[in-house]
Amino acid sequence: MELWVPFALFWVDLLTLEGLVMGYLDLARSRYSCREFEDRSVEQAVVDAIVEAGRIAPSACNKHPSRVMVLDTPELLEKAASCQPRFARDGSIFGAPLIFLICSVTDNAWVRPYDQMNSSTIDTSIVCDQMMMEAEEQGLGTCWVCHFKPELAREQFNLPEGVYPYHMLVCGYPAAHIADPEQREARTIPLSDFILK
């Protein structure tokens, strides 16, 4: 069966395009923690697309407690690096030109009644993951950083009362080297261990 769709002045054969479209699993497998970036800024349209991916992320009971701060100036990047000096490089974390600080208005988050678990950690993690995958789709490298001093981040970025920082998503165009997918697969637990029976 052949399926044709008019597109502008062209006729596009969708079956021909099938092999060109990356599926989600391919995208997820291509992602790796990037810690070296090119010395160039990320275009505003790309930043906007990544933020939008986070904005539409699901949350417990649709409470949407997550908030995102875009750190893309030398001053803001330096402040981010001060929250974890171990990762500081070239005035940023890993020298990245762009960092998203992902926070939660914790009082707005859903609380599980049986044990009072606040969903902020989960909700912000979903936001971070969706932003990370959109960044990958846009050709950026990313590194999800939780190892930073949250109280210092609150102070450095003058976060309002009740807003707590959970993650930093470090982004930029990756340096020439690319992580070996086979090596990454070797470090990932096998399916037989992943599934509980």
Describe the predicted segments one by one.
Residues A153-Y166:
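Short, electropositive alpha-helical surface patch
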Residues R67, F148-P150, H167:
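Residue-level "edge-of-site" marker
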Residues V46-V51, I56-V127:
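Glycine/small-residue-rich phosphate/adenosyl-binding loop
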Residues S104, H147, Y173:
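Short secondary-structure boundary segments
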Residues Y24-C34, E43-V46, H167-K197:
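C-terminal helix-cap and adjacent tail motif
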Residues P6-V21:
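Short, Lys/Arg-enriched N-terminal segments with co-localized hydrophobic residues
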Residues L3:
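Cationic, low-complexity basic patches in intrinsically disordered or flexible, solvent-exposed regions
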Residues G54, F100, D115-Q156:
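Small-aliphatic-rich amphipathic alpha-helix that forms the alpha element of a beta-alpha
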